[in-house]
Amino acid sequence: MFNKSLPGVLNTAKSSFALDQNSSEGEVMMTAMGQGKTTVSPYHMALIAEAVANGGTMMQPYLVESVTNYTGSQIRKNVPKSYKKVMTSDEAAQLKEYMTAVVEEGTGSVLKGRSYTAAGKTGTAEYSMSDGEKTHSWFMGFTNVDNPDLVISVITEGSDGSSRGKAVAIAGDILDAYYN
């Protein structure tokens, strides 16, 4: 799904990474963990989280579940449709287990004990070391782990090193507002 258009109605930038036969081992390692010349959008990260939540199947995204007119009659309803299988169900189950552990005992633990369960992945992308460490703080995940119903992806750009967990806190605020 890198270097390609993503499914759905949003016109987003392509996520990308740049490796070739001349790439050093260091560049390959940095790219493998999402650093280096890797670029990825929050939309793409939400699609990845959604595929994990759905047992490896990426669904065709849509923005609005249904539309009703002024009389309350439903005039359009989007029905979930499979887009493509992007990982095996065993791979998705393993990732779901890891992502649950991030919330239960790791860097996403600020989401533990809420009115919903969550699984997710936090991340920090460093982008400037010249005048102090500058980072992007990430969180992507899903809620109601046993029967997933909502996916979220948050990035805070241009943070200083002290706000590494900012994205997961913002995700918590958004999810709390949704569920409460």
Where are these regions (language model features)?
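Short beta-strands and strand-coil junctions in structured, solvent-facing domains, enriched
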Residues: 160-162
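Short, gly/Ser/Thr-rich active-site loops of penicillin-recognizing serine hydrolases
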Residues: 74-81, 168-180
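Short, conserved glycine- and acidic-residue-centered signature motifs
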Residues: 41, 164-167
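Beta-lactam-recognizing serine transpeptidase/beta-lactamase-like catalytic domain environment
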Residues: 1-156
